Design a protein with these regions (language model features):
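Nucleotide-activated donor-binding/catalytic signature segment of Leloir-type glycosyltransferases, i.e.
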Residues: 42-81
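A conserved mid-protein helix/loop that constitutes part of the nucleotide-sugar donor-binding site
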Residues: 4-20, 43, 47
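A charged, aromatic-enriched C-terminal amphipathic alpha-helix characteristic of glycosyltransferases
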Residues: 150-183
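A short hydrophobic beta-strand element within the catalytic core of glycosyltransferases
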Residues: 90-91
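A structural motif in glycosyltransferase catalytic domains
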Residues: 12-16, 29, 142, 175
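Short hydrophobic beta-strand element within catalytic cores of glycosyltransferases
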Residues: 103, 108-115
Length: 183
């Protein structure tokens, strides 16, 4: 996917900002696509998003893969698959799409999907995704919907908790280092 204004990534940043205010979870957003090459305004849109990330104080919470490397990182299929496996959910706020392949990709790995209520997403997601209206629902309302989903789904809470509290760096610091210091 390409980073274009119709993808509505600014809304995703605002949603994340509100989500992080609801509770103490370390919610993060990874934006995988580079700026679309066919519209000269797209690099400017990325600059707007980077400025918004700073304004919302999300510098450590929002990651644009495109900016992580020189030359820019454009994830291959294996990397995207790994991101789906590791993710807690797919946030897809696009205002317009032709089909919505990420819904299929996230669905195949049982990832919860939170997406704009537009015809292609409705057709693909049916009743198995969480819809929001990007024109009517505020970022705070969408954040509350996402928060409530995770609060009510134990399997998803467990996955997030295990990943947050049992990363190798945490296990080493909390379990192995104390054992080694005893000797």
């Amino acid at each position: 996917a390409r980073l274009t204004r119709r993808k509505n990534i600014a809304l995703a940043l605002h949603i994340l900002h509100h989500l992080r205010q609801i509770d103490d979870q370390d919610y993060r957003l990874i934006v995988t696509g580079p700026p679309g090459p066919h519209n000269p305004a797209n690099p400017g849109y990325l600059e707007e998003l980077l400025a918004l990330r700073k304004t919302l104080q999300l510098e450590t919470a929002v990651h644009f893969l495109y900016e992580l490397n020189d030359p820019p990182l454009i994830p291959d299929d294996t990397t995207l698959s790994n991101l789906y496996q590791l993710g807690d959910g797919l946030l897809f706020p696009s205002m317009q799409e032709g089909f919505g392949i990420p819904i299929l990709e996230a669905g195949i790995v049982s990832l919860p999907i939170f997406c704009a209520d537009i015809p292609p997403f409705r057709e693909t997601g049916l009743n198995d995704v969480q819809f929001f209206d990007p024109d009517q629902d505020s970022p705070a309302q969408i954040a509350a919907m996402i928060h409530n989903y995770f609060k009510d789904h134990a399997r998803q809470r467990l996955k997030a908790r295990v990943r947050h509290h049992y990363r190798w760096e945490v296990i080493v610091r909390q379990q192995l280092v104390p054992l080694l210091e005893e000797k």
